[in-house]
C-alpha cells in the first residue's frame, strides 16, 4: 500500500487522486490559519518553489481539530494562504486528522510513522515526507521548521 491509493478534495472541491503525484517527493502537512506555527506556510512555499521543478510538491491539508485554529470555510482558507503567504502548492479541503472520522490518508500516514509516544497527530503542522513510490519515509514534529527538512528532501530527489 502507498499514499497513491488515496484521494482527497482540493480546496476548490475537485477530487484529486494522489496517484497523480506518482514519481514525486511529497511533504504532506496538516495546516491551520490561526496557529502560532502558521508562519511555516512561508517556508513550505520556499521549499515548494525551490524543488518543484525536480519533482517535489507540498500538499497542505487544513484541519480544525486543534483548538479551532482553522475555522474558515474553503474560500477563506484559500484566500488566506494566497494573500498572506503566496501559497501556490496544492491545498486540500479541511479534513480531520485524528479520531474515527480522520481522513483515510491521515489514518494511513499515522499508522506508517507514529509520533512520540503515540501515532496520533498532536498539533497543526505535523509533516510527513513521502518518497517517489508513495512510501512514508519520515514524520516531523509540528515545531520542526520546514527548511530543516531540506536535506531529507534532497536525498529523495
Swiss-Prot record:
Enzyme class at the top of the EC tree: oxidoreductase
PANTHER family linked: GLUTATHIONE PEROXIDASE
Annotated gene: bsaA
Family according to the record: Belongs to the glutathione peroxidase family.
One Pfam family cited in the UniProt record for this chain: GSHPx
Name recorded for this polypeptide: Glutathione peroxidase homolog BsaA
Keyword Cell membrane: no
GO BP: any one term: cellular response to oxidative stress
Catalytic residues in the record: 35
Gene3D superfamilies reported in the protein's UniProt record: Glutaredoxin
Molecular-function GO terms, alphabetical: peroxidase activity
Enzyme Commission numbers on file: 1.-.-.-
Keywords: Oxidoreductase, Peroxidase
